[in-house]
Amino acid sequence: MRTDQVMLSNKNTNTCCVVSSSSSDPFLSSSENGVTTTNTSTQKRKRRPAGTPDPDAEVVSLSPRTLLESDRYICEICNQGFQRDQNLQMHRRRHKVPWKLLKRDNNIEVKKRVYVCPEPTCLHHNPCHALGDLVGIKKHFRRKHSNHKQWVCERCSKGYAVQSDYKAHLKTCGTRGHSCDCGRVFSRVESFIEHQDNCSARRVHREPPRPPQTAVTVPACSSRTASTVSTPSSETNYGGTVAVTTPQPLEGRPIHQRISSSILTNSSNNLNLELQLLPLSSNQNPNQENQQQKVKEPSHHHNHNHDTTNLNLSIAPSSSYQHYNNFDRIKEIMASEQIMKIAMKEKAYAEEAKREAKRQREIAENEFANAKKIRQKAQAELERAKFLKEQSMKKISSTIMQVTCQTCKGQFQAVAVPAATADETSLVVSYMSSANTDGELENGF
């Protein structure tokens, strides 16, 4: 065992794994109301709840370096590493070595072990919450206390410290996620919307600030005070544009200018509103009314107390401002996802049909090739049968020619096959000449 492993015994009173006698343990004998019940070993052991580990187990505390090692158990013969002791024992059987080397060094009974986390602030650092599996404590330490993300997804750039988590993520990544314009993929709609808000906020923050509107459109007005803002000679100009360049004290301005300046200040900060001052519907001809007022009351030209300002103030949001609605965006996202899912299903179905057609085509081509081979083989067999038939006919003809008796030869010729080809005839003639020569030699001797 390595030096960085510290074996702690539960018999020590300093550890918190010791269960007091007053605590209720389902595996201890209890006496209530005069009835004594004892759970024997023949009964089925129930699973212990969290916080009550096996009192006979040994508490093992491994260092972070040991927990981050990928292969803990190493074969002495081939130096191959394994994560579990059982895998090492199975591997040792492949080496044809004596049984003594396969046995353990000591015949001491192996006790059950529980593993604690080396991080002091972790819940599993307490022996009461120790983990009973070495692989489990390794995965826990890599997930919670390790910053080394060894496996990174190529689609969403999400890193994982445990390979099993990375493989599980690859099965679902991109199938049911929400992709942003920046390239990130989210599996939850809430996280995706929050990221979209942050991205849009960053874009708005990066845009150059718009200059505040410095002009207010004032249509034809019935009062003389609204038309004499800049100079007294502009009495006949009832409609125009008032340029607001520098702020002026509000006390020396008329009431409609105070309202317009305050609204301009608020609009530049909030919603960029457009301000319009419209006359009342009763004032159909403001020029004629102002001329009559000049003739009848010339002394009231500089007296603003007798003048009345009848204005209609309409405030509307700017057309360039677009209100951001999360609900509409969610509906659009969900609709686009549904369309994308349907398109993906149709694409998968088309690909499957294409693969099936390709497979059927390959099967047909193979059957056609087999049929051609069978046809060629049949033709070869037919040619061979014809050749054998011709050979047999030639042998029969040669046998008939060897018969010396004319009577028997006539009988055989009566039932013989019709005349053969020119080659067969020449062959028969040669056989006849050879037969006659043999007969003459026999008669001569």
Swiss-Prot record:
SUPFAM superfamilies: beta-beta-alpha zinc fingers. Residues 32-42, 214-248 have a biased composition (Polar residues). Keywords: Coiled coil, DNA-binding, Metal-binding, Nucleus, Repeat, Transcription, Transcription regulation, Zinc, Zinc-finger. GO terms for cellular component: nucleus. Residues 188-200 are annotated as: SHR-binding. Residues 22-31, 281-293 have a biased composition (Low complexity). Disruption phenotype: In sgr5-2 and sgr5-3, abnormal inflorescence stems gravitropism but normal hypocotyl and root gravitropism. Slow amyloplasts sedimentation associated with lower amyloplast starch levels. Attenuated stem circumnutation movement. No visible phenotype. InterPro entries: C2CH-3rd_BIRD-IDD, C2CH-4th_BIRD-IDD, C2H2-2nd_BIRD-IDD, IDD1-16, Znf_C2H2_sf, Znf_C2H2_type. GO terms for biological process: circumnutation; detection of gravity; floral organ morphogenesis; gravitropism; leaf morphogenesis; negative gravitropism; positive regulation of auxin biosynthetic process; regulation of auxin polar transport. It is found in: Nucleus. The keyword DNA-binding applies. PROSITE patterns: ZINC_FINGER_C2H2_1, ZINC_FINGER_C2H2_2. PANTHER family: PROTEIN INDETERMINATE-DOMAIN 14, SERINE/THREONINE-PROTEIN KINASE RIO. This is Zinc finger protein SHOOT GRAVITROPISM 5.
